[in-house]
């Protein structure tokens, strides 16, 4: 997860650039390798799928530069905020079952939110609170229009060391930054609230619901909040520009507690706690390409699928966002804090999955994703 500004920049980068290639190469690897050679990209796994099959899967560069460990198709990544669309999909399963409605007030399911206030005035000397015009709703926490802040003080600097129920109680006593429904404010807190609603409404823990209702049926065998010992060895190292801005420096993600397999001190975060592979994420995207169903099983109704992937934010707001999906004219998708992304183009019948572990890039490394997506569209989108 990351700051509002950086996540908006990441979502904006999901748009496809103009065609680059006179003759479309058969493989994307040759186009991506120069970024690796120039130390602008550590490594990546790039996947293209249609409704039924994988059209391309390629790995380039390194999962561990110092250890000379090559990136592989089954390398694992912290997908961070790409967890959000999966959480929203789970909420819509419960909507389909009539257990919750998008326009329910959050306080209907989480009574601790009764009496939540909004900031009316604030300066260095005082803060004035008042009652909001209406309680925040499930829809508003999913489309970032609730007025909730990005996170609470309990999540700094590490996001995953507080149980979900306790974390959400901290949000309930946190004043709203703006009136519900009036301002787009990217809020991981809001998505964590939705995850807690899943628990209360379903009678299952959030992670159990996700595993039983989404990950296991889709065959997402490497999607987890707790990579086991073997999986942890497959998690790619994280990189950012070094002090000179011309090379890559390895770093450890501070938002996560370690070891990653610790189920006693690490807790699942609905807004950004998942680890996954490109291939697992591709399964999720194929379900979306098929309008909420895959391999003979329906996960969400057609109506719920449309709610997830249509613009929910009002025309008065510049940010085009659905229920945990960034929404463009002919695409929807989401990115993650470490520059991962998934993008679905229903009219083309294609989805692209881009897996890296980067907090920024030296040189032109940030363009590698666009090069891959342009290649994918020109190679398979006709």
Language-model features: where?
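Cleavable N-terminal signal peptides
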Residues: 9-10, 20
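Short, Gly/Ser/Thr-enriched beta-strand-loop segments that form substrate-interacting elements
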Residues: 61, 312-346, 356
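Short, surface-exposed loop or secondary-structure junction motifs
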Residues: 117-330
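Short, well-ordered beta-strand elements
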Residues: 56, 342, 349-362
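Short, conserved catalytic-motif segment at the N-terminal edge
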Residues: 25-77, 99-101, 115-122, 169, ...
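Short, gly/Ser/Thr-rich active-site loops of penicillin-recognizing serine hydrolases
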Residues: 290, 294, 309-313, 317-318, ...
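Active-site SXXK
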Residues: 29-32, 46, 52, 78-106, ...
């Amino acid at each position: 997860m990351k700051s509002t500004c950086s996540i908006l920049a990441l979502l904006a980068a999901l748009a496809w650039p103009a065609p680059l290639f006179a003759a479309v190469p058969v493989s994307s690897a040759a186009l991506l390798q120069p970024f690796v050679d120039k130390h602008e990209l550590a490594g990546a796994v790039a996947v293209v799928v249609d409704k039924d099959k994988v059209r391309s899967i390629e790995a380039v560069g390194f999962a561990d530069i110092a250890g000379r460990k090559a990136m592989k198709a089954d390398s694992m990544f912290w997908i961070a905020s790409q967890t959000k669309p999966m959480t929203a999909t789970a909420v819509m399963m419960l909507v389909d079952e009539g257990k919750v409605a998008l326009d329910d007030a959050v306080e209907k399911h989480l009574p601790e939110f009764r009496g939540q206030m909004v900031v009316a005035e604030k300066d260095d000397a005082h803060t004035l609170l008042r009652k909001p015009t209406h309680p925040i709703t499930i829809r508003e926490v999913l489309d970032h229009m609730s007025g909730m802040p990005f996170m609470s003080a309990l999540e700094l600097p590490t996001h995953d060391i507080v149980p979900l129920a306790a974390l959400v109680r901290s949000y309930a006593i946190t004043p709203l930054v703006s009136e519900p429904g009036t301002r787009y404010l990217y809020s991981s807190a809001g998505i964590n609230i939705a995850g807690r609603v899943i628990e209360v409404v379903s009678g299952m823990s959030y992670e159990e619901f996700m595993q039983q209702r989404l990950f296991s049926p889709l065959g997402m065998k490497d999607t987890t909040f707790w990579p086991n010992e073997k999986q942890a060895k497959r998690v790619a190292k994280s990189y950012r520009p070094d002090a000179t801005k011309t090379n890559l420096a390895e770093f450890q993600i501070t938002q996560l507690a370690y070891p990653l397999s610790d189920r006693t001190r690490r807790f699942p975060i609905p807004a950004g706690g998942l680890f996954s592979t490109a291939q697992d994420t591709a399964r999720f995207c194929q379900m979306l390409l098929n309008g909420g169903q895959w391999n003979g099983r329906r996960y969400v109704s057609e109506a719920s699928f449309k709610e997830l992937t249509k613009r929910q934010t009002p025309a008065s707001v510049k940010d085009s966002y659905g229920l945990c999906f960034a929404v463009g004219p002919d695409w929807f998708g989401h990115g993650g804090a470490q520059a991962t992304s998934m993008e679905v183009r229903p009219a083309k019948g294609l989805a692209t999955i881009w897996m890296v572990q980067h907090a920024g890039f030296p040189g032109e490394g940030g363009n590698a994703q666009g090069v891959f997506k342009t290649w994918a569209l020109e190679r398979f989108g006709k």
